[in-house]
Amino acid sequence: MTVNIRNWQELKKPSNLEIKTGGDGKRKATFVAEPLERGFGLTLGNALRRVLLSSLQGAAITSIKIENVLHEFSSLAGVREDVTDIVLNVKQIALKMEGEGPKRLQLSATGPATVKAGDIMVSGDIKVMNPNHVICHLDEGATLNMELVADTGKGYVPATANRPADAPIGLIPVDSLYSPVRQVAYKVDNARIGQELDYDKLNLTVETDGTVTPEDAVAYAARILQDQLQVFVHFEEAMSDSGLIGMAAPSAASDESDVNQLNRFLLKKVDELELSVRSANCLKNDNIIYIGDLVQKTEAEMLRTPNFGRKSLNEIKEVLSSMGLRLGMDIPGWPPENIEEMAKKLEQELLG
């Protein structure tokens, strides 16, 4: 199979991603990507928006149980809000949870008092992100004892789905909005390259509930799209008989100098590359020793490496490109059994 890599290599891609933050950068930010090929602003903006709103993991309250309350249409003496209003207020509590749920939380208060989300007693792996959110108001002498169940998930789950089959009397299921993203909007403008205006500029504005930063939310969404689309790419298995992606197999009559040069690159250790300390440490922690180890990693695999981000990825891609290499290569017979001996021999040749 012959693959025309120009299909994707010659398309315009954003040179950088500009991030504009307002008063609260941990909750709201605008991402500006340019230049993009005409139509790609709409394509990427719509795809990111849909994934941001529907597919990110978060935490939410799934049910509550209030002392002396049998159902949500009840009322409590000395509590200004009825139970229906309390349920609506509980739905808006923003939680950040480490690990898996469900987790049981307790809330106890005595009036007069304004009961807020910050009054909920939580364990060390749960944090209330909007502690000033009002749940209800208690008059003099009134008491409120409530048990809340929090869980992790994605998207929106209606209250009917949160009611277990063996639900005890008095359990009130709550609609759960797990998504940490509250609003997403995008706008596509014209972008200029030289005298040409036939390019797109994508402006993506993301607002979260504070449990995740806008930067992380967009990164998660992009990663989800990347993983979902990866199944459609089959070039790694069918690029050429040599198994080297983007590199032609040498003919029998061709000179072996190109192959020898390639082997020299593959046998070099990654610590010989002029990489930033962060990138070098990430490779070391992932046990990537030789360039031959590195080039067989895909971009998706590299981004799964702890503390390895897009900036480090671009740095490594640029260094590999200067040697005629790239990520995602398939090197038959790698690593060779005598790799250390071969590497030492290469080093001696270079020194000699």
Swiss-Prot record:
Catalysed reaction(s) here are: RNA(n) + a ribonucleoside 5'-triphosphate = RNA(n+1) + diphosphate
Q: What is its EC number?
A: 2.7.7.6
Q: Which Pfam families match?
A: RNA_pol_A_bac (PF01000), RNA_pol_A_CTD (PF03118), RNA_pol_L (PF01193)
> EC top class, in one word?
transferase
Asked if the Swiss-Prot or TrEMBL record annotates the protein with the keyword DNA damage, the reply is no
SMART domains given for it? RPOLD (SM00662)
Which UniProt key words apply to this protein?
A: DNA-directed RNA polymerase, Nucleotidyltransferase, Transcription, Transferase
Taxonomically, the superkingdom here is Bacteria
Alpha N-terminal domain (alpha-NTD) as annotated region, ranges: 1-236
What the entry lists under InterPro entries is as follows: DNA-dir_RNA_pol_insert, DNA-dir_RNA_pol_RpoA/D/Rpb3, DNA-dir_RpoA, RBP11-like, RNAP_asu_C, RNApol_insert_sf
One of the entry's Gene Ontology molecular-function terms is: DNA binding
Its BP terms in the Gene Ontology are: DNA-templated transcription
The domain comment in this protein's record states:
The N-terminal domain is essential for RNAP assembly and basal transcription, whereas the C-terminal domain is involved in interaction with transcriptional regulators and with upstream promoter elements.
Give the record's family classification. Belongs to the RNA polymerase alpha chain family.
This molecule's function is given as:
DNA-dependent RNA polymerase catalyzes the transcription of DNA into RNA using the four ribonucleoside triphosphates as substrates.
- Give the matching NCBIfam families: PRK05182.1-2, PRK05182.2-5, rpoA
Q: What is this protein called?
A: DNA-directed RNA polymerase subunit alpha
Organism for this UniProt entry: Sphingopyxis alaskensis (strain DSM 13593 / LMG 18877 / RB2256) (Sphingomonas alaskensis)
